Amino acid sequence: MPRNEDAMMHLNWAREAEKQRDFLAARMGYLKCVESWKQAGDNAELEKATKEYEAFVRRDPIFEKLISALLPIIQANPGILQSDIAKQAESMDWAALYSYNRPVAREDIYYALYFAGKFGRITRTKKGRSYELRTPG
């Protein structure tokens, strides 16, 4: 399947998953859509898909739950490394986060931290193979 068709398929799946309130599937669909446009080399479509993905993240209740649990850790430990906070967060009780039995994965934590940085809720500064995390101000 050509990358542009692949991207559109993932975009449609993402939109449908969000309508069904399956936010994890929607996130994966948007991510795969963006990656497909990136691989296809279509910058105009990539930009549109990226904007739609970012808009989804702002609506994603899982993102909000994740970041609301991660922000206090960052505030209490300015400069904590992303790899260290991911280890701490993986051991936290996230039972209410998903409506199905799935533990929070490192990718979930990185998703929340990446977009929190992109949206200005935290700062992420490259430090070795990880990122140093701080709250703004």
Segments predicted by a language model, with ranges:
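Residue position in alpha-helical solenoids
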Residues: 16-17, 36, 43, 56
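Short amphipathic alpha-helical interaction segments
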Residues: 100-118
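Short, cationic-aromatic polyanion-contact patches
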Residues: 126-137
